[in-house]
A protein has these predicted regions:
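Structural signal for interior beta-strand "rungs" in well-ordered beta-sheet cores
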Residues: 1-186
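An accessory alpha-helical subdomain
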Residues: 196-217
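Conserved beta-strand-loop-alpha-helix hinge in the C-terminal portion
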Residues: 180-198
Length: 217
């Protein structure tokens, strides 16, 4: 722990946690084993963080929701294992109207300037590219990718393995495996590149593609 960092005596730190200069960890924060805060990281609120997460400079985790209905309720932010939070990433906890929890699962990458609002649920192996932003109550299923400078409207659900192209505005639910692009989202086809990268069996890809054609003509 760097001597310039301020760590609450009420915070819980696991084994081999590394905290660089000018970090702040407030009351009720729990950091599990092998996490690293490089520098200038602020973690606050009722925030529970799993193992081997890495936080880059100026990431701000657990500050109160940007929801005007929030009245200081004791909500939570839960983060799993092996996630990367790059510079200037912001994540807010839940609210009363959303079950009181924002949750991030495992092996996700949140690139520079991305934002996860209150009451979001993020699956595993999700990527938010630079400056992608999620409104409140958004659900992102496993292996989805949200392109840079995209905005996902509140209450939208993004299906597994879907890809959202850069600069997209997403206002409706997105089917699993779908590829969407545009200032307003429009269906362009299947995310075949993503399926192949994840080594999905070719016979399953054919089945998905045939189903897609039948439903969407």
């Amino acid at each position: 722990i760097h001597p310039t960092s301020l760590i609450s005596s009420k915070a819980v730190l696991g084994k081999n946690v590394k905290i660089g200069p000018f970090c702040i960890i407030d009351d009720n924060v729990s950091l599990n084993d092998d996490c690293e805060l490089i520098s200038n990281v602020h973690i606050t609120g009722n925030t529970i963080i799993g193992k081997n997460n890495k936080f880059f400079p100026y990431s701000t985790i657990g500050t109160i929701p940007q929801d005007l209905k929030f009245k200081g309720e004791d909500s939570k932010l839960i983060i799993g294992n092996n996630n990367s939070f790059r510079e200037h990433v912001t994540v807010n906890p839940g609210t009363f109207d959303g079950g009181m929890i924002t949750k991030i699962n495992d092996n996700c990458t949140f690139m520079v300037g991305s934002h996860i609002a209150h009451d979001c649920y993020i699956g595993s192996n999700v990527i938010l590219v630079n400056n992608a932003i999620l409104g409140g109550h958004v659900i992102i299923e496993d292996n989805a990718i949200i392109g840079g400078n995209s905005a996902v409207h509140q209450f939208v659900k993004i299906g597994k393995y879907a890809m959202i192209g850069g600069m997209s505005g997403v206002e409706t639910n997105i089917i699993p495996y779908g590829l969407y692009t545009g200032i307003r989202d429009s269906l362009r086809g299947l995310n075949l590149v993503g399926l192949k990268r994840k080594k999905v069996d070719s016979s399953n890809i054919i089945t998905i593609n045939n189903t897609f054609k039948k439903i969407f003509n």
